[in-house]
Every structure is written in structure tokens, then in C-alpha cells.
């Protein structure tokens, strides 16, 4: 049997059918007095609510019994409550009309925050399936509301260029600004926004990207957009990819049974040293996340098809490459074409780290 959720909320309906918000305008003594003289009800399911005023947790409403109320995107936590209150304050201070936990009956969804009636902010602290996230986004689209997803953080991030392990729902939260994608995050204890930007896929849940933060006091709305990587920053990206390439090769060589190993078979087929691949194999390529295969492997498959003059769409349809969920064949073919144009331009040329950086960074800049 599925367990029902304990739902904590910040908005309730009074006996007079008015909405009462817990946004910090009342101190605890005032709330205790209000609780003694007022009854509260869930704006969605009309069930009675308790006003809870603890010494540690943020004041909030909760259903008197375990609830089947299904209009909330996630069960509340103190982090989620704190984050929503700080975001509410953020928009109020910038003179936006902001509604907390606004219920949209046309789509049976409740936005954590609704800005000027046309922009929903979802502050997501718990895991959500990419499919559910997409369903909620499509719901907002049906009523002409733009949605922005912000990932809640339990601890601050390390800043700079580095290796990131991203879950599928975090990837689904990506926002686009032109050709640049990024994930927006928020750490309530420090009232600080973080960005994971310039994300480049390596394999599985491993990405390379730039993490940078900005205090809420300096944030704008529409939210600030990260900048592309400088050449010096991209060199760090290249160094990480180089180390990840070595790690991948080492794992393949230790895997045993090289005859069945796809990586080893491709190397033999292409007459490449299994322990020392050409520099242009395993490089960062925008859009690599369209393939489930690690960067080294799909690039080897692309080179093998190129040498055999196999059309890219035939390679994709052959089953040798597996598209990620939601990836389109046309997009995947464009990534392969982009990579092979880079590879074939410098195939057979001796490349040092500096010239390789020039090539890959130049191609990265062309995608912006």
C-alpha cells in the first residue's frame, strides 16, 4: 500500500474564506493568539489544517490527518519551506506581484511561487522523475505560464570548473538562454543562488561544468545568465576530459575478454593502440548527452562509421549508438556531424595540448 504524505504548507483558508499566508509578517506570539481564535482549512481539499508553531521549525500548516491531497509538487521539508519564504521575499523586494502556493484549477497544479500571474517558480528539494517534471512543465504551458525550476541545496557547492555528478531530474531542470544551458540552484541557509553552467557530458551521470554563486541581494529577475567559458577555463575542462579518458581506457583494459569488449574491438578495427588513443578521441562536444555511450565510445563509433563511409543516420539506426531519453535522431546526427567535421579536419596531424585546445575551443565558441 502506498504511504500517504505528510504535507506542510504556508497558505491556508480561514473560516471567512480568506487566504492566510505564513510569510514572516507575524511573530510566534501573534501566531499563537491567531491560532486560538481561528480555524484553518486546506485551500485545495478543504480539510482542516493545524497551525504548527515550533521552537525549531518554521511555522507552517499541516493536515490534521495524513492526507491524500495531491496538488503539491513535493512533500515539504524545513529546507523547502525556508527556501520558498526567502524566494517570496526576493520577489517582493523587487516589487513583483508574488503569490505563494498558488493553485491553478485548470491544470490541477500548485506553483510554489507565481510571479505577476505568468511565471511559475518551482523550488524542488526532493527527487522528482524527469517525466513528472515534464508533465508539470507542460501543464504550465497549457495555461501560458512560463516555468522555472530551481534545485534546492542542502549544502553549498564547490565553485569553479570541475567534475559534476548530476541526476536525471537535475538535468531535466536545465534552462536555456540562447544556446547556453544551465541549472539554477538555491541554498536557503546562505540565501544564495548557484549555477551549474557550460555543462559537457562525459558518461553516465558524469559531467564537466562551471559552478558559480551569487547572493540573493545581487540576483536579478529575470534571473542572471551565466557567461560562456574563457579559453583559460576551457583548458581546465580539457584537462578533466583527458584524465577521464585515461580512467575510461584503464577500466576497459582491466575488464577482461577483449574480444567481446566493444571498445577494444573498435580500436583493433581502426588500428589504434588500445592504451593510447589519438588526441581527437574523447574530447568535449556540446550535445554529447544525446548518446548514452561514454564520450570515448561514441566518438570511436563515429570515426569507424566515417572510415567505412556509413551515413550517420544509418549508424544511429544500427543500434551501435543508443540515444538518451527524449533525444531526437536529427539532433544526434548533428552532434556526430559536428564532431566528425572537427576530427576529419585534423586527422593524421600531430597535435600538442596547445593546438588541440585551440581546435576544440574554437569549435565550442561556434556553438554559442
Task: Please give the residue ranges for each predicted region.
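N-terminal cysteine/histidine-rich coordination modules
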Residues: 1-96
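Short acidic/glycine-enriched loop/turn segments that link adjacent beta-strands
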Residues: 57, 106-109
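Conserved catalytic cores of phosphodiester-cleaving nucleases, focusing on short active-site segments
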Residues: 87, 111-129, 140
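A short acidic/basic microdomain associated with nuclease active sites
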Residues: 88-107, 116, 124
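Catalytic cores of nucleic-acid endonucleases
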Residues: 125-180
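A conserved mid-domain beta-alpha-beta active-site/ligand-binding segment of alpha/beta enzyme cores
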Residues: 169-228
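Long, charge-rich alpha-helical interaction segments
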Residues: 224, 229-244
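Extended, amphipathic alpha-helical scaffolds
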Residues: 249-368
Amino acid at each position: 500500500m502506498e504511504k500517504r504524505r505528510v504535507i506542510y504548507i504556508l497558505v491556508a483558508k480561514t473560516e471567512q474564506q480568506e487566504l492566510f499566508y505564513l510569510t514572516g509578517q507575524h511573530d510566534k506570539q501573534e501566531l499563537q493568539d491567531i491560532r486560538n481564535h481561528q480555524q484553518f482549512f486546506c485551500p485545495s481539499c478543504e480539510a482542516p489544517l493545524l497551525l504548527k508553531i515550533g521552537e525549531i521549525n518554521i511555522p507552517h500548516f499541516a493536515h490534521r490527518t495524513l492526507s491524500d491531497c495531491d496538488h503539491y509538487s513535493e512533500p515539504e521539508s524545513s529546507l523547502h519551506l525556508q527556501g520558498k519564504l526567502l524566494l517570496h521575499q526576493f520577489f517582493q523586494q523587487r516589487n513583483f506581484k508574488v503569490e505563494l502556493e498558488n493553485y491553478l484549477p485548470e491544470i490541477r497544479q500548485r506553483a510554489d511561487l507565481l510571479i505577476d500571474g505568468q511565471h511559475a517558480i518551482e523550488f524542488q528539494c526532493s527527487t522528482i522523475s524527469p517525466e513528472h517534471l515534464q508533465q508539470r512543465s507542460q501543464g504550465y504551458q497549457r495555461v501560458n505560464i512560463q516555468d522555472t525550476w530551481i534545485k534546492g541545496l542542502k549544502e553549498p557547492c564547490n565553485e569553479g570548473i570541475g567534475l559534476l555528478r548530476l541526476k536525471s531530474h537535475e538535468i531535466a531542470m536545465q534552462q536555456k538562454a540562447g544556446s547556453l544551458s544551465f541549472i539554477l540552484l538555491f541554498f536557503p541557509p546562505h540565501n544564495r543562488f548557484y549555477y551549474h553552467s557550460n555543462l559537457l557530458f562525459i558518461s553516465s551521470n558524469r559531467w564537466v561544468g562551471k559552478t558559480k554563486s551569487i547572493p540573493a541581494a545581487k540576483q536579478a529577475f529575470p534571473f542572471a545568465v551565466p557567461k560562456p567559458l574563457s579559453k583559460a577555463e576551457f583548458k581546465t575542462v580539457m584537462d578533466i576530459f583527458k584524465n577521464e579518458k585515461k580512467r575510461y581506457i584503464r577500466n576497459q583494459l582491466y575488464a577482461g575478454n577483449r574480444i567481446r569488449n566493444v571498445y577494444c574491438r573498435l580500436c583493433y578495427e581502426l588500428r589504434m593502440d588500445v592504451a593510447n588513443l589519438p588526441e581527437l578521441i574523447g574530447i568535449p562536444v556540446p550535445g554529447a548527452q544525446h548518446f548514452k555511450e561514454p564520450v570515448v565510445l561514441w566518438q570511436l563509433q563515429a570515426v569507424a562509421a566515417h572510415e567505412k563511409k556509413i551515413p550517420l543516420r544509418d549508424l544511429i539506426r544500427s543500434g551501435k549508438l543508443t540515444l538518451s531519453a527524449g533525444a531526437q535522431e536529427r539532433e544526434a546526427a548533428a552532434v556526430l556531424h559536428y564532431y566528425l567535421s572537427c576530427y576529419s579536419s585534423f586527422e593524421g596531424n600531430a597535435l600538442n595540448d596547445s593546438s588541440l585546445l585551440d581546435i576544440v575551443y574554437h569549435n565550442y565558441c561556434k556553438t554559442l
